[in-house]
């Protein structure tokens, strides 16, 4: 494990332990941000912990986190942090929240780590080195028929009849099984071969930077609604190779 990945794993584990101290706490303080989403002391303290560790080890590296102002990079390296992906789940005592951290070098994400502290699961990947869950290699599933696939959607609109004719939206009517697991947890189900597709319609860089290398190194693919692999796109789709390739072909034909 290279030093950058080792540092990312250590930070994700330390931040995870910090969040567990707040998890299911009845006296948890909850605040509302300008975008009307919730944030807790655990979110802020976990991000501060990771940001401080990065500054200590790599003072010229940049840091982009969900909760605080970006610290610009002076060397082309930028760490991207989501201290608690799934804050609403965290607040309600649902153990599916994740601590996410990625390293981007010259605009390309090189590694990603996602820790699920309440589950005891740690996913990580580095470009060209495969993807792992708790130290064991993982791969996406080989299911190629969408009628046999499990598709996960985050937004409640997918349970309604008024979805668009976009190929990704149409999965709801074609899939063998549709479920509503959101946030990074759903995408890790794809990476580990337990689901075939996971869809998030609204994503920020800190929501997806860590999960993209894990899914792709597990043999899958990630792209937005335009079919582009990016951390700054229009939503995010994670899929196994077979179904992802078919989806991309359908998007290109639109």
Language-model segment annotations:
Residues 28, 61, 129, 175-176, ...:
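A structural micro-motif
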Residues 19, 43, 54, 87, ...:
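Residue-level signal for inorganic ion chemistry
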Residues 1-84, 229, 242-243, 249-252:
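N-terminal subdomain of lithium-sensitive/metallo-dependent phosphomonoesterases centered on the IMPase/IPPase/PAP
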Residues 139-254:
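An extended, acidic
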Residues 73-132, 149:
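DPxDG-like acidic metal-binding loop motif
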Residues 41-43, 47, 66, 82-85, ...:
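Acidic active-site catalytic centers that drive phospho-/nucleotidyl reactions
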Residues 104-108, 118, 127-130, 136, ...:
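Short loop segments at secondary-structure junctions
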